[in-house]
Amino acid sequence: ILTGDMITRAARRAGLNAELVFVVDNADPLRKVYPFLDASYEEFIGHQLGAIPAPDKDGKPDWERFENEGWSYGDHFLAPFLEALKQIGVEPRLIPNLTSYREGKFASSAKKACDDPGAIREIIERVSGRELPKDWFPWQPLDSKGSLDGLTITGYEYPLVMWTDQYGENGQSDITKGEGKLPWRLDWPAKWGFNNITCEPFGKDHGAA
């Protein structure tokens, strides 16, 4: 983000109309129960960071603040980062990714991907040199408990992706309402589009196939 800030400042000095934005990836899932979390967070593995409660001082889910203020896990860990940026004069405009999904801003890109998953698969496999799972699909629905993990896609008819989850429940995900998300390789360019991003510094890990 500091590289982005330097580019923004340089662009402004050159007379360009530039703005620094920071996309908050709070639609991404909780990967595991980290050492600072209570074991009760086990139930939230696979759930989106912007949709689960933040930990309290004991590492337990702070349900009261989540229900009263909407203070999420993502908010909790974003706050000190933003404060540190503010101290050095960096104040980007924030774009919560989960909000963008829920507002339907990913709908057009999601439709393009879901309408032709074979083309997406071919590109990823050709560029990366690896084979995707046979059940791979370019949309990750939320299951019956709100997790992105353990689902099998059973069908697609715009705007609905049909699924069966690990609990044996069947359901459908509306790609226009953010009832799931795109895999990161598709999420990334999609948000460039509707956020009008023209430049984004990134690490070599993101540049790898």
Regions found by a protein language model. Name each.
Residues I1-R121:
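N-terminal Rossmann-like or analogous alpha/beta NTP/dinucleotide-binding catalytic cores
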Residues D116-E122, R126-A209:
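Alpha-helical recognition segments enriched in aromatics with Gly/Pro capping
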